[in-house]
Amino acid sequence: MNKNNWIVLLILCIWFVISFVTNILGPMLPMIIDSFGLSLTLAAFLPFSFFLAYGIMSIPAGMIIERFGGKISLLIAFSLAFLGAGLFVIFPTYPIVLTSLFAIGLGMAMLQVIILPLMREAGGEKKYAFNQVLAQIVFGAASFMSPFVLAGLMRKLTGEDSANDFFIRFLKGITPESLPWSSLYFIFTIVFVIMLVVISYVKFPKVELKEDEKAGTIQNYKELLRQKQVIFYFLGIIAYVGTEQGLANWMSLFLNMYHGVSPEGAGATTVAWFWGLMSIGCLLGLVIVKLIDSKLMLRIFSMIAILNLAIALFGPTQVAIIAFACCGFSISIMFSVIFALALNSVDKHHGAFSGILCTGIFGGALIPFIIGGL
């Protein structure tokens, strides 16, 4: 394996970390609520803190990579994530978990912006599309695995069968007995340290941003924001990410409150299959988009998503579980299609427009917060 292929492998590992850390919050949310005795409104501040960071950091991250390059930017991103996770390990309280999630969110937002051009430079233009699909598969696999890892860890930490498991006994020793889920933050801290060490020793190729990847000037943003379609596509990204995270964060708690489903059992499994079916939908979407018009595909999948959600909200237990999971498939193509349609709607300033659209990931903070408030 040549040197650049090792870098591509490292980037895929970073995608795995981003996905696992980002999407573990949903299945963990009922446990956090129970541990801290939170109201749903206070609980809603948890995903709000994390995705608020995405909204704040998306545009500055592009400027940071232009100024400092890929390697330094990666080190900054993982340092922020390390500080966030480490802070909660030391001070496991509700106010600190909000601060921790915000800091980790800043790091994850930076990473997503940095590794796209880095993947292109390391893997080459010819393999870029293939590597992006591979990254999407890795991202989906991590999302699918995270609820199962959480459920398995909770069974070990709260059970009596861990006497011969050194690592579990070690986690029990450093984790507050009433907060077994917080052991994941210790694991995240270790992972972030490992990534910092590895990245510090790796020589990355110089990242030359294309014009459509550069952050752009203030004037570029002003010019874009005067255009009606830019605002509509921005709102579309807010709506999509808000729907995705609203479902992922609240479905387990919904199933627990209205159907008595265990968050560590069927609730976690439902969240896992939500992400798993989303990944399958993304792969099928690569084929379907070649056969039918993107706008038509978006309309069809949107109608299926509305139907799935209605069944999930009002159906009996087993039907609701299946419908919530199927929501992942029905919204799977929306982000990529909306993003592509948006960029194709303008003939210049694509880098600045991408920054505006990525800021719309703030919808992952806004919509779940509204759901919690309701």
Regions found by a protein language model. Name each.
Residues 56-95:
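Conserved MFS/SLC helix-loop-helix module at the cytosolic interface between two early adjacent transmembrane helices
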